[in-house]
Amino acid sequence: MSRTSIQWSMFTKPWPHLPIADLADLVAGMGFDAIEFPLRPGFQIDLEELPHSAARASSILTDAGLRIASVASTPSEPVFGACADVGIPVIRIMAPIAAAGYAASDGELRRYLDSLVPSCERFGVRVGIQPHIEDYIADSFELANVLADYDPAHICAVWDSAHDALARKPPKHTLPALWSHLAVVNFKNACYEQAGRRPDGSRVWKTEFVAGADGLGDWSEAADTLVDGAYSGNICMAAEFTDETDLEHKVARDFAYLQSLLAASEARAAGGTPEAERSA
């Protein structure tokens, strides 16, 4: 893997009210090549005006040197069509646990994905599934079991460092499990913090999204795994923090931290010393 072969994107969910031109300036100014856009109600692209609203936004982003690398959205026909029109390759979704329970979820999910494959073929746009804790397929191992029966040109994987970490699944195992279908690598981090106690004295835990260096996810191990596997796709900084104070600084700090880890991994793989250590 070479960092120059990576497309660096940022999920822009925290900035729903920023005009698209200002959003483009923000993302480009932080050193990213692309964005993941939340194609949902309440954001800069009007769903009622697709595909024209997506084309307008894409044009503004292109002028700033950016592209839309993926969208987080519901894969409806209008969304597929808009993505195809402006060259957005991936629609990211999660896979919920069925109302009938976990045992029923596999069949229900496969029927849903089967229904999406014709649109993937028609529009040339992939659907990427991201694991998510709680009421969804929660980790990469569960996801790999589903994806094994699908062509990665249609249904692909979005690896997520935080949600695998919350499920206590290490990157050295989860990334290879998804490798054949891997389209996007999400970096954010999280941990569990005590939120109080119940009347019976037992602890209550909550999820906290924190800095890349502070969570359960081992970003260094993830960097090593990506480098060893010569990954060359999209890496997305998810910009998700429970405390959004000084958010732009936090994203920039995590971006720099990840870049340093990848540089160290590349140097290790090449049998050399990271540039920062050579100049120290």
Predicted region positions:
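Active-site acidic/histidine proton-transfer and metal-coordination neighborhood
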Residues: 21-22, 29, 63, 67-157, ...
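N-terminal pre-domain/capping segments
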Residues: 1-90, 180, 255-280
